Amino acid sequence: MKNLEQTWRSILDEFHQQANLREGHIVVIGCSTSEVAGRRIGTSGSEQIAEAVYKGLEELRDRTGIALAFQCCEHLNRALVVEEETAKAYRLPVVFAIPVPKAGGSMASYAYKHMKAPVLVEQIEADAGIDIGDTFIGMHLKPVAVPVRVSQKQLGEAHVTLARTRPKLIGGVRAVYEAE
């Protein structure tokens, strides 16, 4: 578990540097703890792995002021666990269910139990995202998503994909995108 935690912190450090995360940004996290453990998604959830992932994200949140949004599994329509203050600040309509490992997933369930005032929302437009185990978080990212490449491409046995977003470039041939 120690190696997993070190790898995770390394991934988060590189992600933070490249994605330019700061206060006011929302980061969506999709995590299959089963995939991290080398099993098929949705079959072998692990609270121990969820705890390690959550703690690393808490540290990142405390350092940067970002808001975290944990994606539930398909059984809860990929709803997101966020702090109530995040839902209010971003005017996100709250829905209700209590994520549990078999309906929501171990990661979302762990987050729900350990956040100060957790609520569920159906949609979000996050500024950045972390997908551990191919959970498909793209539906919750703002357009335009830009891949973030880090040196570690796996957490345990799970494939890790990271993204940041940028504003759409508008205009035509006369548009200017860089300040002189």
From Swiss-Prot:
Gene3D superfamilies recorded: Hypothetical protein TT1679
Highest taxon in the source lineage: Bacteria
Pfam families, alphabetized: DUF436
Family: Belongs to the UPF0340 family.
Protein name: UPF0340 protein BLi03936/BL03990
UniProt organism field: Bacillus licheniformis (strain ATCC 14580 / DSM 13 / JCM 2505 / CCUG 7422 / NBRC 12200 / NCIMB 9375 / NCTC 10341 / NRRL NRS-1264 / Gibson 46)
